[in-house]
Amino acid sequence: YVLHGNQTYPGGLIRCGDAPQLLFYKGKLPAEGARMVSVVGTRKSSDYGKKATEQLIRALRPYDPVIVSGLAYGIDIHAHRIALSLGMRTMAVLGSGLGNIYPDVHLKEADAMQEKGAVVSEYFHYESPQPAHFPKRNRIVAGLSAATVVVEAGIKGGAWITASLANDYGREVYAVPGPWSAPTSRGCHQMIASNLASVLDHPEHLARDLNWLEKKPLSAVVIPEFAQPVAQALFRHMAPMHINDLSRVLCMPIARLHGLLLEMELNGW
């Protein structure tokens, strides 16, 4: 578990006034600054909704986000499954304890996502799922991410709660438009009409709005140990340096520095 205020407590969530003081988890919590998107929707998803979910997550894959959802039937579990199939990180927020995965038919997905992502809950280990838990857990789904995408929704339901909470938290909220006569898209259309959500007519618009200009986050860059002294000196200087100046700063002979720089270049630096 992680306590509110701890360094590893999710950054997006800590900025919410009603965030849980204690968060239980299995797996790996995302590092500070990780890109996170919540993907939610109706439990009675259509083929259109499933296809839209897959297209969305596939398009976001190059930006390496964590896909957050609630492990429920319908859009939630489809979002988790697509992320897992693409080797992406995904996080499930439960309305029960970690020792009482609900629905239990999704236990396989809950276990699989712990390799790169996590399963989280504010409830004690064997807490059973209660009707009141699910609207409450939606604040965590909304609070974790920079944006919430509603793929399909009826005129009421949990997706509405999550979208409203995300809006209250000042996060981006999107709704995917659907066939005008489809009951599973009526909620999305109403969210758009009431200005609760922006139209998401192409997945790249989300990446643009969130300023994901580079497709690799900084956290993905690993500096080899041999290159760290040079990299640290350059980062501190924050400008190009002549090799003589770099040699002086590092107290390193120029001949040795030449060899080190050549090795860095051969390794893609």
Stretches found by the model and what they are:
Residues L3-W269:
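Glycine-biased, small-residue-rich flexible motifs in mid-sequence functional cores and linkers
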